[in-house]
Amino acid sequence: MARCRRHIRSRSRSRNQCQRRRRRSHYNRRRTYRRSRRHSRRRRVRRRGCSCRRCSRRRRRRC
């Protein structure tokens, strides 16, 4: 039975490859969008805790 099940699984995979690819591409798009938001947040955090000459002179922690 295990062999038969494996064969069935492989068949279903080959059939649903295009559908899976579509789903993956859509998921990746959302993922990249999330990443970009995260990066922007990180940059803001860095700006808050800045330690450059300009910020130290003006007693600011932003660049």
UniProtKB/Swiss-Prot annotation:
User: Main subcellular localization, coarse class?
Assistant: nucleus
Q: Which domain of life is it from?
A: Eukaryota
Q: Does the keyword RNA-binding apply?
A: no
* One GO BP annotation of this record: cell differentiation
Region entry Disordered: which residue ranges?
1-47
Q: Name one GO cellular component term.
A: nucleus
Places the protein is found = Nucleus; Chromosome
Q: Which GO molecular function annotation, any one, does this entry have?
A: DNA binding
Q: What tissues is it present in?
A: Testis.
Please give the family membership noted in the entry. Belongs to the protamine P1 family.
Summarizing the function annotation, the protein's role is: Protamines substitute for histones in the chromatin of sperm during the haploid phase of spermatogenesis. They compact sperm DNA into a highly condensed, stable and inactive complex.
Q: What is this protein called?
A: Sperm protamine P1
Q: Which organism is it from?
A: Planigale tenuirostris (Narrow-nosed planigale)
